[in-house]
């Protein structure tokens, strides 16, 4: 998503062509998702080819451990298979956190996953939470011209990251017109 936004907005070329440069005027959600799909397919192919070149087996399946070194694979349309290995890497991905105090409805209030179902880019948005995903979405949508306000109860973004890096991140976020509301709690939604 980030790479698609950087490409479509022309952000990386602005130091050459000026701050108003963009690859496409009036970027739509369809443009963003189309470019995101292209980036994902391309990057997936690169990683898959690198893994295969290095003799690593890949299996897309539901897996469960039989014992410490054996995995049972269940794939649609194929027989159940067992694989034994000294080392196993489990890549499950992540799910969006859902604060129980926030009434996610998929219409006005979205998780990061649901944001990808938008038909149009919003004119403005508030991002609740200054963790990795919140910061990523705030910066992506700001680059696309959306007015973004990021609210976080903590006094500093990404507390596990070096201060100099965060200072640079905050500078660039503000430069892209992200409003930061740190050390503030969301008490209600309108």
Cite the ranges covered by each PLM segment.
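Glycine-rich flavin
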Residues: 1-121, 154-158, 164-176, 181, ...
């Amino acid at each position: 998503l980030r790479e698609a936004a950087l490409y479509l907005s022309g952000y990386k070329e602005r130091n050459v062509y000026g701050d108003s440069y963009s690859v496409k005027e009036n970027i739509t959600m369809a443009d963003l998702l189309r470019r995101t799909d292209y980036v994902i397919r391309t990057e997936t192919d690169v990683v898959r080819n690198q893994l295969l070149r290095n003799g690593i087996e890949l299996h897309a399946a539901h897996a469960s451990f039989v014992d410490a070194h054996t995995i049972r694979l269940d794939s649609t349309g194929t027989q159940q298979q067992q694989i034994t290995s000294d080392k196993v890497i489990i890549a499950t991905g992540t799910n969006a956190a859902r604060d129980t105090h926030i009434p996610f409805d998929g219409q006005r209030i979205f998780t990061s996953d649901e944001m990808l179902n938008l038909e149009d880019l919003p004119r403005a948005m508030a991002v609740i939470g200054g963790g990795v995903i919140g910061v990523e979405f705030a910066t992506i949508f700001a680059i696309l011209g959306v007015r973004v306000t990021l609210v976080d109860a903590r006094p500093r973004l990404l507390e596990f990251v070096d201060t100099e890096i965060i200072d640079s991140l905050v500078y660039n976020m503000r430069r892209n017109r992200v409003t930061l509301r740190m050390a503030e709690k969301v008490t209600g939604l309108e």
